[in-house]
């Protein structure tokens, strides 16, 4: 008789019984919270046409999708992302404003040594139809309430701007890919070599060298003002309009001016929440106004995602 192989494939995600119990408890807390804030739970399909993701200017990597051919000969992918299907549904509706919540898994091919899961469980919200500052403040407020419900300790909320990042890339001397990699790695020595290579001097040089070490808005505003760049100033003005404190009762709030967008469709505010002892973000979110335009609807949109596997890790570390 052939010997059975009982090993799980690398792509599988598995959780202990105690982990499942913890997950279900916090899942219910978040569901109750979202319902209390009028976020309607929706359940997008597990399968989508590959073209839904690749046909958008959203930075999706097709090689990370789990794909197969259906009975009609069309390319299908396991759910790669929640935001895109929900944005599509909203754009095709007659609604002018919507609040959605979701609970489910996404599937992306990831290398295990990077600490990311190929099969990950996500809980999240999408707010569609509100203007930038109003929508940003509501989603950040809901994020803080979610942190309180999760009872995570020693949390840091990092605030960034996709508009700020994209303008920096435009000013990077035609070497945007390397520039982005340096930001993502937080490589101070690499950035020093970068500005030397491009012979940057004065205010632009000072700005780039300060990106990874500056965590307060007033200091960064002075550095940007010295460059005279209007787009960079506008991006910081949007962050300033949020009027965020340095900390709340449940978390510290830092600015990360070197933050690289986790999703290619982000256009404005970005944020990530980290908890002590967990390398990856427990919550991530951002504004994605241009995504809806690709579906023919022009309005504000922002959301966030709770990475439940990382939350369970954080709670186990407490």
Swiss-Prot record:
A Pfam family assignment: tRNA-synt_His
Q: Which cysteines are joined by disulfide bonds?
A: none
Which Gene3D superfamilies does the entry mention?
A: Bira Bifunctional Protein, Domain 2
Pathway recorded for this protein:
Amino-acid biosynthesis; L-histidine biosynthesis; L-histidine from 5-phospho-alpha-D-ribose 1-diphosphate: step 1/9
- Report a single Gene Ontology molecular function: catalytic activity, acting on a protein
Q: Which InterPro entries match?
A: aa-tRNA-synth_II, aa-tRNA-synth_II/BPL/LPL, HisRS-like_core, HisRS/HisZ, HisZ
The organism's superkingdom is given as Bacteria
The record's subcellular locations are:
Cytoplasm
GO CC terms: cytoplasm
List the keywords (alphabetical): Amino-acid biosynthesis, Cytoplasm, Histidine biosynthesis
- GO BP, one example? histidyl-tRNA aminoacylation
Give the family, as the similarity comment puts it: Belongs to the class-II aminoacyl-tRNA synthetase family. HisZ subfamily.
What do we know about how this protein assembles, alone or with others?
A: Heteromultimer composed of HisG and HisZ subunits.
Q: Which PANTHER family match?
A: ATP PHOSPHORIBOSYLTRANSFERASE REGULATORY SUBUNIT, HISTIDYL-TRNA SYNTHETASE
What more does the entry say?
This function is generally fulfilled by the C-terminal part of HisG, which is missing in some bacteria such as this one.
Q: What does this protein do?
A: Required for the first step of histidine biosynthesis. May allow the feedback regulation of ATP phosphoribosyltransferase activity by histidine.
Which protein is depicted? ATP phosphoribosyltransferase regulatory subunit
């Amino acid at each position: 008789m052939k010997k059975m192989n009982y090993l799980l494939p690398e792509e599988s995600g598995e959780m202990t019984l105690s982990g499942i119990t913890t997950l279900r408890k916090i899942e219910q807390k978040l569901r109750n919270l979202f319902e209390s804030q009028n976020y309607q739970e929706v359940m997008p399909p597990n399968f989508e046409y590959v073209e839904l993701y690749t046909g958008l200017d959203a930075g999706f990597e097709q090689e990370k999708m789990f794909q197969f051919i259906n009975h009609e000969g069309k390319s299908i992918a396991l759910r790669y992302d929640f935001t895109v299907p929900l944005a599509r549904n909203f754009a095709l509706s007659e609604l002018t404003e919507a609040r959605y919540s979701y609970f489910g898994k996404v599937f992306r091919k990831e290398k295990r040594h990077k600490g990311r899961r190929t099969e990950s469980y996500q809980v999240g919200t999408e707010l569609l139809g509100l203007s930038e500052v109003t929508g940003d403040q509501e989603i950040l407020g809901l994020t803080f309430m979610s942190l309180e419900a999760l009872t995570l300790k020693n949390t840091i909320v990092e605030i960034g701007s996709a508009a700020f990042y994209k303008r920096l890339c435009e000013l990077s001397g035609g070497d945007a890919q390397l520039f982005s990699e340096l930001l993502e790695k937080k490589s101070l020595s690499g950035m020093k070599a970068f500005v030397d290579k491009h012979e940057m001097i004065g205010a632009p040089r000072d700005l780039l060298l300060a990106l990874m070490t500056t965590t307060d808005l007033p200091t960064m505003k002075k550095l940007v003002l010295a460059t005279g760049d209007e787009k960079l100033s506008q991006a910081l003005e949007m962050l300033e309009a949020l009027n965020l404190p340095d900390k709340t009762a449940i978390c510290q709030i830092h600015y990360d001016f070197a933050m690289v967008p986790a999703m290619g469709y982000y256009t404005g505010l970005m944020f990530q929440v980290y908890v002590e002892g967990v390398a990856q973000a427990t919550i991530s979110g951002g504004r994605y106004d241009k995504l809806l335009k690709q579906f023919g609807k022009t309005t504000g949109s922002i959301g966030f995602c709770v990475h439940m596997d990382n939350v369970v890790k954080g709670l186990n570390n407490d």
